[in-house]
Amino acid sequence: MLDNYPDVLNVSDVQRVLGIGRKQAYELVHSGNFHVINIGKRIKVSKSVLIKWIEGEKNNHAN
C-alpha cells in the first residue's frame, strides 16, 4: 500500500498519502486518532499505525 514510503512518516508524507492539505494533516496528527511521536518540533507517524488507521476508517465507513 505504502511501499515507496519509509517506515516512519512525517506530516508531509501523511499529507501525500491521504491527499489532504497541510493544515488538515496537522489537524489529523494532533487529533489523537492515532499515536504520533514528537521529536522536538518534528512529528513522526509509524507507517503501520497509519495503515491500521486507514483500514479502520474504511471499515467504519462501510457500516
Where are each of the predicted segments found?
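Short, well-ordered alpha-helical scaffold segment located
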Residues: 24, 49-50
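Glycine-rich loops and low-complexity Gly/Arg-rich segments
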Residues: 2, 33, 61-63
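Polyanion-binding surface elements
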Residues: 1-24
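A short, Lys/Arg-enriched interface patch at domain edges and termini
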Residues: 50-63
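Alpha-helix boundary recognition
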Residues: 3, 29-30, 55
